[in-house]
């Protein structure tokens, strides 16, 4: 595993060209819902301007780029890990599993996988579990590597939409506003309305609420 802490412009250019899959996750911190990952292979001949870490973009800009990425990217796939898997494996290992699912489901086998952060799981393409794909962890890669930026945008928009749907089902929890993160409003809703099947039972605030039954 390579960790590019002081990545050079030359490395960025090299890793941003060719059929490299960028991978990022959204949703490790929330108390509810899936952790969502995305794998994106961009078309070097059809660049997208304005890509950046999804957290640094407005919702409107993310939605516009989400559509453009789907229009121009060579390949996109999304992976999930459920609340039950998060509770069983822990959030780190569940996130790694979701990343593996995102890469395994790509229609194109990438030359390598570039993951935002400081660690990466083993990646394989489809059912070819003997054919391991080279992978690199890139610290702050969502602001450095276009494919990782694209993956962060895809994962963020998908998860936000999932929270909007959950909000329609349980409007009293305010998921459309706080997206499941541990905010004061979420704590108050937990206390007042209780734990939902979609909550992560291993996370402390949820576990403490369950203990009050």
From Swiss-Prot:
Extract the GO molecular function terms from the UniProt entry: manganese ion binding; RNA binding; RNA-DNA hybrid ribonuclease activity
Q: How is the cofactor bound?
A: Manganese or magnesium. Binds 1 divalent metal ion per monomer in the absence of substrate. May bind a second metal ion after substrate binding.
Q: SUPFAM superfamilies, per this entry? A: Ribonuclease H-like
Instruction: State the UniProt keywords alphabetically.
Output: Cytoplasm, Endonuclease, Hydrolase, Manganese, Metal-binding, Nuclease
GO annotations of cellular component type: cytoplasm; ribonuclease H2 complex
Q: Which residues form a coiled coil?
A: none
Q: Does the keyword Lipid metabolism apply?
A: no
EC number(s)?
3.1.26.4
| InterPro entries membership | RNase_HII, RNase_HII/HIII, RNase_HII/HIII_dom, RNaseH-like_sf, RNaseH_sf
Asked whether the UniProt record includes Isomerase among its keywords, one would answer no
| PANTHER family in the cross-refs | RIBONUCLEASE H2 SUBUNIT A, RIBONUCLEASE HII
Q: Can you say what this protein is called?
A: Ribonuclease HII
